[in-house]
Amino acid sequence: MKQTNISVFIPHYGCTHICSFCNQKTISGHSEPVTEKELESILEGQLENLKDSGTKAQIAFFGGSFTAIDRDYMIRLLTVAKRYTDAYPEQYDGIRCSTRPDCIDEEILGILKSYGMTAIELGAQSMNDEVLTANRRGHTAQDVRRASRLIKQSGFEFGLQMMTGLYKDTEQYCIDTAKEFIALHCDTVRIYPTVI
């Protein structure tokens, strides 16, 4: 069975910092966060494609810091997503999100679990504090370690996102970040080149 993501963009919503490399509105092609109606339309519109192709999909909230968005809005989106994973488990087999390491705590993980979240990707980008500071990330490598531990302990599929070529980055820093990602025992890694 093939697996894919149905990406739902919440461009820059929930982000507390403007990182040196980021303009989610340009990257995603979306200028406003998705509404519940738009989410329903996206998921409804993909059902036949998924059935016909025999593909399963995770509903993926990307392009912002999902766990830092307005709590009521987040729960409304999760309610819609859970309705589809419950009603169409052969097509929608999970919910995933990306977020910042400093926006993870036990309370938010409990909420995500109760609404059927299955996977969390942390936008770590680097495990070097000098690189993180130079790129205005607003979190530290220790925040990544702490959030990673909490996510793993809570039983989610756990992914890390790495960016190569950031300001102040070096080949050795990238190698060190990769080694630390391995040590954190993540299930997946996304590696992005920095393009400005």
Where are these regions (language model features)?
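Radical SAM enzyme [4Fe-4S]-AdoMet core and its adjacent flexible, acidic
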Residues: P193-I196
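Short microdomains enriched in Cys/His and/or Lys/Arg
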Residues: K37-L50
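Conserved non-cysteine loop/helix-boundary elements of the Radical SAM core domain that shape
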Residues: I27-K37, G63-Y88, Y92-T188
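N-terminal pre-triad scaffold of radical SAM enzymes
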Residues: M1-S28, L47-T67, R96-R100, M117-A119, ...
